[in-house]
Amino acid sequence: MDIEQVRDFCVAKKGVTEHFPFDEVTLVFKVMHKIFALTSLNNWENGEQKINLKCDPDKSEELRAEYVGINPGWHMNKKHWNTVTVNSSDISDDLVRELIVHSYNLVVNGLTKKIQKELREL
């Protein structure tokens, strides 16, 4: 996947917005104002195609053991975030999409019932 495919997949999810809250190169995807994915555009330009995604702690451990391209989240809470190297030889596009959906769903499930209702009504 290239950055445009990642971006298109993320923004196609219900209630997702994209931002640059930290600087002009850190692209952040939020659902209902909560981050579920972020990446450095500089890294993509330099061939380091990485994205940070939220992940269930138990699943994080399993994924890190199984895939060379999945590591503890860089500059993130290592228990709840993974850095996924999208162009790693052991990471398929389908797996990237699956992990984006997992991250999105984790964040949505953590929203208050009121905000979940607002999201459903979009």
Positions of the model-derived regions?
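Charge-dense, helix-prone N-terminal extensions
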Residues: 1-122
